[in-house]
């Protein structure tokens, strides 16, 4: 049992270390291209609809979060006949972003420990 646990920990450590190295290689190779994409994204961000604001005028205008684009969700308030639409982030995408952030932080700690 101890061997299986030790092997599992070693496997997870090696996987996170190798994925951190691949991310570093990706960052160095495409730095110029990434900067141009960020500039375009900043220019486009001025036109998007922020989270929890009305998006009924353009249902595809919601802003992006760190990884995913927000979704225009429409509903009828209780006792009302008018449809209300707001930009919202689905819960499953919110949890995926949190998990990706924690994985990035953990990969950085592993890299710091092993040089």
Curated annotation (Swiss-Prot):
The intrachain disulfides are 48-63, 55-72, 62-87, 74-85
Q: Which residues form the signal peptide?
A: 1-20
Q: Does the keyword Secreted apply?
A: yes
Q: Where expressed (tissues)?
A: Expressed by the venom gland.
Q: What is its main location?
A: secreted
Q: Where in the cell is it found?
A: Secreted
Any one GO MF term held by the record is: toxin activity
Residues making up the propeptide = 21-44
Coiled-coil spans are none
In the UniProt record, which is one GO cellular component term?
extracellular region
Keyword Electron transport appears in the UniProt entry: no
Question: Which keywords appear in this protein's UniProt record, sorted alphabetically?
Answer: Disulfide bond, Knottin, Secreted, Signal, Toxin
Per the entry's comment, what about the domains? The presence of a 'disulfide through disulfide knot' structurally defines this protein as a knottin.
Q: Which family does it belong to?
A: Belongs to the neurotoxin 19 (CSTX) family. 01 subfamily.
| Name used for this protein in its record | U3-lycotoxin-Ls1c
Q: What is the lineage of its organism?
A: Eukaryota, Metazoa, Ecdysozoa, Arthropoda, Chelicerata
């Amino acid at each position: 049992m101890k061997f299986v646990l030790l092997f599992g920990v070693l496997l997870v450590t090696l996987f996170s270390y190798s994925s951190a190295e691949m991310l570093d290689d990706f960052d160095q190779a495409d730095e110029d291209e990434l900067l141009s994409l960020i500039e375009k994204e900043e220019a486009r961000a001025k036109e998007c609809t922020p989270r929890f604001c009305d998006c009924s005028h353009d249902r595809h205008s919601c802003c992006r979060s760190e990884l995913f684009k927000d979704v225009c969700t429409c509903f009828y308030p209780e006792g009302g006949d008018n449809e209300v639409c707001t930009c919202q982030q689905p819960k499953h995408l919110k949890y995926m972003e949190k998990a990706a952030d924690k994985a990035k932080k953990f990969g950085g700690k592993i890299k710091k420990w092993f040089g």
